[in-house]
Amino acid sequence: MSLDRALPPPTAITLVTAPGCHFCEDAHKTLTELTHRDPSLALQLVEAATPLGTALISEHRPAMNPLVLVDGRYFSAGRLPRRKLEALLARRESVAAGGVRNG
């Protein structure tokens, strides 16, 4: 009997950036560091001017750049809220490990 369980798919983090955006640069640096530390995270970088970037901006209508999505859902716009992101990822990790989801 094998104790191996199928690993859940990685958590997809999409970062939609614009040129000259210092919040975008900061978010990119932070998210790159996070994905290097945690292999269960996958970062997708999308330029706002690309067709995909334009579509995501049209769909989510962020007030500021960058737009950050977690598994395709709106997470934030503007300065990346690091503590909020860490809390979300910790909750997702707990649920994936079989814990109870609170909210």
Predicted segments, located by residue:
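Structural micro-motif
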Residues: E59-L69
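Thiol-based oxidoreductase modules, predominantly thioredoxin-like and allied folds used
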Residues: P39-G53
